Amino acid sequence: MDRFGDISEGEVDHSFFDSDFEDTKKCESNSIFDKQNDDDFKEGINKDIKNLNLKFGVQNDNLKEKIDNDTENVNVKLGIQTKENYLTQKGNERKPKFPSKEQHVENDPIQTRSPSLLTSSRSKKLCDTTKGNKLHLPVPNRIPKIVKGEDDYYTDGEESSDDGKKYHVRSKSAKPSSNLKKNNTSKKYSKASSSSLSSSSSRSSSDCSDIGSDMQNKPDSGSSGKRVSSVTPSSPKQKCKSGRKSSAKQKAGDYNAESEDNVTDVTPASTPDSSPAQPFELSQSQNQKVKVKRQENVSRDVYEDVEALKNDSRCLKSAKRKEKHGQNFAPKSSVLDANLDRRSKQKVLHDTMDLNHLLKAFLQLDKKGPQKHHFEQPSIIPRKNYSFTREEVRQIDRENQRLLKELSRQAEKPGNKSTIPGRSLGHPPKLYHSALNRQREQQRIERENMALLKRLEAVKPTVGMKRSEQLMDYHRNISYLNPSPSVRRVRSTLGHYSPLRGASRTSSATSGLSCKTDRSVLDTSSGFLLRPKPPNIQCSNSKVLRSH
């Protein structure tokens, strides 16, 4: 009795202690009739379910809610029509058989209608239509087992009220054996637990549960006959729960059979609650990617843009001044961690500044040439360097200034350009022995030529070295040595051919003519070789001539 805590007032049905064999024959006759009607009813409902499933597969996600509403209306109408026909036949057949328990059934519909009044108007109409028929039907003898964890499972008010009323339609039958009862109940509620999880995702599953409850009217009447009632019927909530569980079991069996035969199975997903988390996770991953990209772009901009680094350095200086004045009281550990990034940025900034100064210096050297260079030294600003100590900074500045001064001195020297090619010629390339011999021979010839040129440049012309004068002196000397008529004849000829007689020997015009005549005479008359006389002979000849 602990399982059925919701049973009202703990009423007990004393018919539980009666014999079970009285109702077995009735159960068999009812089960045969129920099976015949149930087969036809199942086929019609299966076709409707297939059509609904095809419609669900074709329609878009935006039209699902409309289709759910339409299917609810269709299922309710079909359920009302089938229940009216079914209940009228069952009530007329079983009316004379069970007159003793009609009074008990009259109390049940009143209980089931009381919670249904709180639901929609549709549930009220269903209660009114099924009221007269339920008065003639028996009550199931046994209350079904309630599985834990499914007590609070409700789809909406309409379904709970409909399922509660459908549960009263089930016929009472005998109980064949305890073994069959245990097997059926265990299978029944194991399927119900699995199907309840799969059918909780959408409203279409709840509609199918309504149809499944109609399909289960006959089979459940046979199975309920196996149970012997020991307690009075439960409250409407429990009846709705049990009816829903049994309909879910029958629905799961029908869907399994259809999924094997049909290709287009459009049953809802078993875990719909996890689907909204997927786009949220995707959006989170996309946001993380965007953040990573932004961080990469920021890091690139920090290390590539020198102007941004300058601005950062100014901000750091202002922050440091605030710290000195006592505005910032951060702990030393956090300041040290922040200084690591600042030092790297400051180092890059100072390196770029030094390179810029060197480039400016070299550009000025190329433009101005040998002129004096006046380098604009950077103004010394008292600053705090985060990468080096003050002593190291001063040492680096001194070294940079020294290097700049040396470069400026080398540029100011006038003979700087002439010394550079001399260094290149001072170290000739290494040659083979044959090339060396040729080079030495060439150098020797050049030396001899230079000496001969110097000697020729040093020679000065002598006085009286003309050709005509030399010939005259020569002939005189010969005449003095060998006085003969030939010599006189030569003299006469010379005097005859000379146009200017008695002219001075020093005249240039007579000397030119005498040269030509002397050559012709000497060539024809005598074959003497004309050679220049040494100066001593000339002097002697001149003296002799003067003496004469």
From Swiss-Prot:
One Pfam family from the record: Hmw_CFAP97
Disulfide bonds: none
Start and end residues of each stretch annotated as Disordered: 85-297, 407-431, 497-548
UniProt keywords, alphabetically: Coiled coil, Phosphoprotein
Domain of life: Eukaryota
Matches recorded under InterPro entries: Cfap97/Hemingway, Hmw/CFAP97
Keyword Transmembrane: no
Coiled-coil regions listed: 383-460
Ranges of compositional bias, category Low complexity: 112-121, 191-209
Compositional bias (Polar residues): 214-237, 264-289, 504-514, 537-548
Family that this chain belongs to: Belongs to the CFAP97 family.
PANTHER family according to UniProt: CILIA- AND FLAGELLA-ASSOCIATED PROTEIN 97 (PTHR23035:SF1), CILIA- AND FLAGELLA-ASSOCIATED PROTEIN 97-RELATED (PTHR23035)
Protein name: Cilia- and flagella-associated protein 97
Gene that encodes it: Cfap97
